[in-house]
Amino acid sequence: FTNLILIIFYLFPGSIFGYFLYDNSYIQPQITKDFSFSDFLISSNHLYVFIFLSTIGILAYHNTSKINFLINYLFLLSIILELFHNFIPNRGFEFSDLFGNIMGVVVVVILYKIKKKYE
């Protein structure tokens, strides 16, 4: 269910939150400032969304044989959804968003691997 909601939000032409909060789908609410490392930018909104999504997935599948499939799926989803922004009206592909998506998955997977190591 969470996966379906994420896909709807990502593929919606414009910002659903902007539409409801500001009555303008062209405005994207910003949770915190994006993370900047010299010339390297990571979208904070995308990072938080994929941390949330990855955490839900890991919690749901951590004791099953599907965990490796889930991790690969999350990485693939984080890339494909951002690439689709090239084809959706009022959306655009941005490397900072892609890096935020991927880093959200990476953070949760690293924490999961550390936890598994010390169980």
Where are the regions that the model predicts?
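Bulky hydrophobic segments
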Residues: 1-98, 102, 106-119
